[in-house]
Every structure is written in C-alpha cells, then in structure tokens.
Amino acid sequence: MFKAGALWLLILGAVHSTSLFIKQVPANDTERQILDLMTSYRFNLSGSLRSMSDLMRGFSVAFMLAPLAFGVLDLVLSRERAGLLKRVALVQIIWLAAMIVVALRYFFAVPLSFLVVALLIFVLAWLKLPADASN
C-alpha cells in the first residue's frame, strides 16, 4: 500500500502539472476583465512587482512539486524497514489531512478528490504496516 501511495502522489503531481500548460480562456467580458487585471496589475511585494497571476502560478507550481517530491521520497524509502515506513506514512497522513482542509476551503472537487484518495491509501498503508519492533 505504501508504494501505491507513492505512485498516487506522482500521478497527482503529474495531473496537476497539466494545468500549467492550459491557457485560461475567458467565457465572457467580465472574465476577460478579471484575467486581464490578474496578469497586468502588479503588487509591490517588498520591492518585487508580482501580478496575481504570478502568485497563483507560483502556488500552483509548489502544489505540483510537493506531491512529486513526496512521491519520489516514498519510492526511495519503500524498501526500508516497516517501522520507518509506518512513521513516514503517518507524516504523509498529517500532511495530506492539512492539504484536504485547505482544499475544502479553497479548491474544487478534482484536486480535493485526488488528495482524499491519497490520504485513504496512506491510512490503509499505516494500518497495514507493523510497528517497528526495535522501539
């Protein structure tokens, strides 16, 4: 199950990366105005001029990199002893639960569903993995 969780995180990151290549097309004049302002109006953030579009792109890239990095880390660790994997699965559970709280407030159904599936896989992995006998 642990390796399945790692693979699911890689899928999550890969699917999210596709959003970085899709250009938003406004459906009406209001959306056109919003998108124009999001890309053209710049905020002075401690001397750096950034648009709302820049900020959203940065957060989107970070959201893509986190599951990719955690998925790779999990694959690298997947052959380690069960006790370590159980602790890493718990860390994944905590991180994913926090992400789900954020997703419930700010995201929509697709990213939320991917996060929930990842959480369920790691909960099952945690339940299935035996505790480390050396502790």
Whereabouts are the PLM-identified features?
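Individual transmembrane alpha-helix segments
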Residues: 51-65
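Hydrophobic alpha-helical transmembrane segments of integral membrane proteins
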Residues: 82-119
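Residues within membrane-spanning alpha-helices of integral membrane proteins
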Residues: 6-13, 60, 64, 89, ...
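Juxtamembrane helix-break-helix junctions at the cytosolic face
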Residues: 69-86
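Juxtamembrane membrane-water interface segments that cap and precede transmembrane helices
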Residues: 39-55
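N-terminal signal-anchor transmembrane alpha helix
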Residues: 2-28
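Alpha-helical transmembrane segments and their membrane-interface exit regions
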Residues: 117-129
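Juxtamembrane non-transmembrane "cap" segments at the membrane-aqueous interface
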Residues: 25-37
